[in-house]
Amino acid sequence: ADEFRATWVANKAVYRTRMAIADGGELVVIAPGVERFGEQPEVDDLIRKYGYLSQAEVLELYQTEADMQDIPHGTAHLVHGSSEGRFTITYAPGGLTKEEIESVGYQYLALDEALERYHPDVMKDGWNEMPDGERVFYISTPSAGLWATKEKLGDR
């Protein structure tokens, strides 16, 4: 959404939907307002240096990297923005380049291409069928909930 200026906040789309995304699936984040990674410059630098990593990778690096130890809330965010290798995260930002997005471990989709393909003004929340027959699950405001499949919830 336009109100999010950093992946720090926009990545609610990642950690609030990860239990609803199929292994091998793809999450497309259309984020026209995103122009940086971190809300604070030092967190932005940390994300740019390490990218989004799995929990195991972060825990290993945390043992030896002073900058990670100095900013634990930023270090935790590196995991919040990770799919843990389960699915692909594709970002369509308004203010970050392809090189910047790919440098942190995400796939890049040009914003104009994303808007042309997915038409957020037309899509309805839930399942939508694209003109080419692809079925996509659209969530207009991923920051407003927590999504999961029955299989991922188990007996909870």
Give the residues covered by each predicted segment.
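C-terminal catalytic subdomain
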Residues: E3-P93
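Extended hydrophobic packing segments that form well-structured cores
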Residues: E84-R156
